[in-house]
């Protein structure tokens, strides 16, 4: 089978590019999640990115509980001036503060299929600077 035929088989034919990108990201996230799992000692820091906002959660996958969360939809981040990258960094600082307050020192970073670039990298770097170990 040729390479083109394999690609056509994987991506929905006749769908627009945004659907293909969303499907490809979901597949990447599924592949990543097969190997990543959060435990009570090192929970999983997962992010979700939309065109306007970012959400970050620290999850214990064994118990199935969200331990701490932060988002750009919170009042202090919403009132902040700056671009989306700066707001992502602020979410990283908040998630690190809240995780430290909950007694969490180390996490497993789940980028959820997004490229480690821009807002995703800014959030991760700010969380590291806030004291979380990845």
From Swiss-Prot:
<comment type="subunit">
    <text>Part of the 50S ribosomal subunit; part of the 5S rRNA/L5/L18/L25 subcomplex. Contacts the 5S and 23S rRNAs.</text>
</comment>
<dbReference type="Pfam" id="PF00861">
    <property type="entry name" value="Ribosomal_L18p"/>
</dbReference>
<comment type="function">
    <text>This is one of the proteins that bind and probably mediate the attachment of the 5S RNA into the large ribosomal subunit, where it forms part of the central protuberance.</text>
</comment>
<dbReference type="GO" id="GO:0006412">
    <property type="term" value="P:translation"/>
</dbReference>
<protein>
    <recommendedName>
        <fullName>Large ribosomal subunit protein uL18</fullName>
    </recommendedName>
</protein>
<keyword id="KW-0687">Ribonucleoprotein</keyword>
<keyword id="KW-0694">RNA-binding</keyword>
<dbReference type="GO" id="GO:0008097">
    <property type="term" value="F:5S rRNA binding"/>
</dbReference>
<keyword id="KW-0699">rRNA-binding</keyword>
<dbReference type="InterPro" id="IPR005484">
    <property type="entry name" value="Ribosomal_uL18_bac/euk"/>
</dbReference>
<feature type="compositionally biased region" description="Basic and acidic residues">
    <location>
        <begin position="7"/>
        <end position="19"/>
    </location>
</feature>
<dbReference type="GO" id="GO:0003735">
    <property type="term" value="F:structural constituent of ribosome"/>
</dbReference>
<feature type="region of interest" description="Disordered">
    <location>
        <begin position="1"/>
        <end position="25"/>
    </location>
</feature>
<dbReference type="GO" id="GO:0022625">
    <property type="term" value="C:cytosolic large ribosomal subunit"/>
</dbReference>
<keyword id="KW-0689">Ribosomal protein</keyword>
<comment type="similarity">
    <text>Belongs to the universal ribosomal protein uL18 family.</text>
</comment>
<dbReference type="InterPro" id="IPR004389">
    <property type="entry name" value="Ribosomal_uL18_bac-type"/>
</dbReference>
């Amino acid at each position: 089978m040729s390479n083109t035929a394999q690609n056509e088989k994987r991506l929905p034919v006749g769908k627009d590019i945004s659907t293909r990108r969303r499907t490809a990201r979901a597949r990447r996230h599924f592949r990543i999640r097969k190997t990543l799992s959060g435990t009570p000692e090192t929970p999983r820091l997962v992010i979700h990115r939309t065109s306007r906002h970012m959400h970050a959660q620290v999850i214990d996958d064994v118990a199935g509980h969200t331990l701490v969360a932060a988002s750009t939809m919170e009042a202090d981040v919403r009132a902040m001036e700056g671009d989306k990258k700066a707001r992502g960094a602020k979410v990283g600082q908040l998630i690190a503060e809240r995780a430290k307050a909950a007694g969490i020192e180390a996490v497993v970073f789940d980028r959820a299929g997004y490229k480690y670039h821009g807002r995703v990298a800014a959030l991760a770097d700010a969380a590291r600077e806030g004291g979380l170990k990845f």
